[in-house]
Amino acid sequence: FAIHHQSDEMGVARPGEIDFSFLPYAHSFGRMMEYLGLYLGTITAYAEKIDTIVQDLALARPHLMPAVPRIYEKIFAAVQHNRASSSAVARIVFDWSVTVGRKRAEYVNRGAPVPSLLALADRIAHALVFSKIHARLGGRMRIMISGGAPLGREINEFFHAVGLPIYEGYGLTETTPILTSNYPGTVRLGT
């Protein structure tokens, strides 16, 4: 019942959408996400191995990805590495885009309307920068879930800024495993 309610509230996935799986099923989070996919009627794409997650994401083109913070940290580090090896102009455009995205995310995370000029700037940022990050993750990612350990605030802010929200959950094996989580429109980063 709790998993059903939480998935409905979050709009986790719809029938026919693709969820991406690499979490071990011996762990309650991975197993619960598998059961949730069966219940919701999603298609599960599996990573070939942990070292090929990014390549597998591009091939599978998932809508949903549950993961532990370490995976999001690795993706963030790869994006930062690409930024650092870019030209000065590209770094300026990247930094401007992330700043715009963070401002937009503040409105979205509290369920407030985004001002028109900020929405326009965000569409430009998406076209110039964010679309490339989305493409590396398959281009259809709607929701990412993090659990198993605390997710660094800087990393979560970045993903929200680029339009790839990560919803943090907390739970225990005994709570199957999600006890509480952030929901779209009511996100408090770092909680």
How would you label these PLM feature ranges?
Residues 1-12, 131:
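Conserved structural elements of the adenylate-forming
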Residues 7-48, 53-57, 64-67:
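Conserved AMP-binding loop of ANL adenylate-forming enzymes
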Residues 47-191:
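Conserved adenylate-forming
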